[in-house]
From Swiss-Prot:
Disulfide bonding pattern of the chain: none
Organism whose genome encodes this protein: Arabidopsis thaliana
Subcellular location: Cytoplasm, Cytoskeleton
Keywords assigned by UniProt, alphabetized: Cytoplasm, Cytoskeleton, GTP-binding, Magnesium, Metal-binding, Microtubule, Nucleotide-binding
Region entry Disordered, spans: 428-449
Gene3D superfamilies documented for this protein: Helix hairpin bin, Tubulin/FtsZ, C-terminal domain, Tubulin/FtsZ, GTPase domain
Major subcellular location class: cytoplasm
Protein name according to UniProt: Tubulin beta-8 chain
Cross-referenced InterPro entries: Beta-tubulin_BS (IPR013838), Beta_tubulin (IPR002453), Tub_FtsZ_C (IPR008280), Tubulin (IPR000217), Tubulin/FtsZ-like_C (IPR037103), Tubulin/FtsZ_2-layer-sand-dom (IPR018316), Tubulin/FtsZ_GTPase_sf (IPR036525), Tubulin_C (IPR023123)
Cofactor(s) it depends on: Mg(2+)
Reported function: Tubulin is the major constituent of microtubules, a cylinder consisting of laterally associated linear protofilaments composed of alpha- and beta-tubulin heterodimers. Microtubules grow by the addition of GTP-tubulin dimers to the microtubule end, where a stabilizing cap forms. Below the cap, tubulin dimers are in GDP-bound state, owing to GTPase activity of alpha-tubulin.
Other noteworthy facts: There are nine genes coding for beta-tubulin.
Residues bound to Mg(2+): 69
């Protein structure tokens, strides 16, 4: 079976992760003690993707939980599904990273990383055919960003041919948790560009907007935000866990979404959006799902796809529906909004269909888009970074942990390069692409003469 190993790090990562396991357990009919309570055999058919079956018939998540302080771990452990995890897979320190990337990446995190890798190795050896890793973390803090990226690079060394998928929560434009978020995020992106295969970009502000605007929640809690994220996470991998007409896995997803290796930061969306309490009673139609899914207000990160163009996109539909209708709707979207898609990648929208809908819904869809407008996120973080770095504000916290100012400069320029790469492909047209080739030929001819 094609297993996925789930890793969650830091406070944010652990809270998202805990919510994710609640959703996946519900989908597979597994209760909080790890016993199967479902009625449908399909729930067990590929339960191995995320679970290891223990000898006593219990299902144990293939999850590694890490943090540099015990607090969040304790709340996960005492949460509704806390008893389902393998106790050895909780790896935590006592010191905390204090929102400092350098502590997570170089000092505190580096001391703990070997024990995390041991657990990862043990879990990977339990797999029949490991497909890849999914990492949940935030980029604004210290542990998720610093230690998270350290772990990703170590796993990259040890398992170079396995997919690395991350769910990364970026600092929000208006809601800031700490002042050094731009530093932590820039240093993390620098790592993610090189070491991750696919990054799902999330941010709290966009999630707040969805909760407030669409779900009509007056005071959204982090629980509500994480509920949205976990619905998307479950949608991304539903094709691996349930049968369907058009299946996809992490690698197929990457092949279809990433035209240039560095441009692997995706916007995600989910439809139908339902508030936690009121699961919708009316069945949606495929056209309605498609429309809601492509809606800019539905994107879970603060970048507006209408300000850029889609290089590629992928949609996963779940529920009983006709593949033909799905294809027609997707082609319809592309024809009506052709200016929002680059014309030099033909057939750049892929759809997959999975027969089993999420719990409580008749149909649902998950959207993943590789849009050039994601540069807005990077641009914003980069501006905040530059504003502080020019004055060398708060830098002693990082240099005190043994970091060099050069690293900051490198990370900054790598992020700016990323922004200009997105911009370059946003502006590129089909004719230009051909034009470049001719120019090169002429140069060669001159040299021969």
């Amino acid at each position: 079976m094609r297993e996925i190993l789930h890793i969650q790090g830091g406070q944010c990562g652990n809270q998202i992760g805990a919510k994710f396991w609640e959703v996946v357990c519900a989908e597979h009919g597994i209760d909080s003690t790890g016993r199967y309570q479902g009625e449908n055999d399909l729930q067990l058919e590929r339960v191995n993707v995320y679970y290891n079956e223990a000898s006593c018939g219990r299902f144990v998540p293939r999850a590694v939980l890490m943090d540099l302080e015990p607090g969040t771990m304790d709340s996960v452990r005492s949460g509704p599904y806390g008893q389902i995890f393998r106790p050895d897979n909780f790896v935590f320190g006592q010191s905390g990273a204090g929102n400092n990337w350098a502590k997570g990446h170089y000092t505190e995190g580096a001391e703990l990383i070997d024990s995390v890798l041991d657990v990862v190795r043990k879990e990977a050896e339990n797999c029949d055919c490991l497909q890849g890793f999914q990492v949940c973390h935030s980029l604004g803090g210290g542990t998720g960003s610093g230690m998270g990226t350290l772990l990703i690079s170590k796993i990259r060394e040890e398992y170079p041919d396995r997919m690395m998928l991350t769910f990364s929560v970026f600092p929000s434009p208006k809601v800031s948790d700490t002042v050094v978020e731009p530093y932590n995020a820039t240093l993390s992106v620098h790592q993610l560009v090189e070491n991750a295969d696919e990054c799902m970009v999330l941010d709290n502000e966009a999630l707040y907007d969805i909760c407030f605007r669409t779900l009509k929640l007056t005071t959204p809690s982090f629980g509500d935000l994480n509920h949205l994220i976990s619905a998307t996470m479950s949608g991304v991998t539903c094709c691996l866990r349930f049968p369907g007409q058009l299946n996809s896995d992490l690698r197929k997803l990457a092949v279809n979404l990433i035209p240039f290796p560095r441009l692997h930061f995706f916007m995600v969306g989910f439809a139908p959006l339902t508030s936690r309490g009121s699961q919708q009673y009316r069945a949606l139609t495929v056209p309605e799902l498609t429309q809601q899914m492509w809606d800019a207000k539905n994107m879970m990160c603060a970048a507006d796809p209408r300000h850029g163009r889609y290089l590629t996109a992928s949609a996963m539909f779940r529920g009983k529906m006709s593949t033909k209708e799905v294809d027609e709707q997707m082609i319809n979207v592309q024809n009506k909004n052709s200016s929002y898609f680059v014309e030099w990648i033909p057939n750049n929208v892929k759809s997959t269909v999975c027969d089993i809908p999420p719990t409580g819904l008749k149909m649902a869809s998950t959207f993943i888009g590789n849009s050039t407008s994601i540069q807005e996120m990077f641009r914003r973080v980069s501006e905040q970074f530059t504003a502080m770095f020019r004055r060398k504000a708060f830098l002693h916290w990082y240099t005190g942990e043994g970091m060099d100012e050069m690293e900051f400069t490198e990370a900054e320029s790598n992020m700016n390069d990323l922004v200009s790469e997105y911009q370059q492909y946003q502006d590129a047209t089909a004719d230009e692409e051909e034009g470049y080739e001719y120019e090169e030929d002429e140069v060669e001819v001159q040299e021969e003469q």
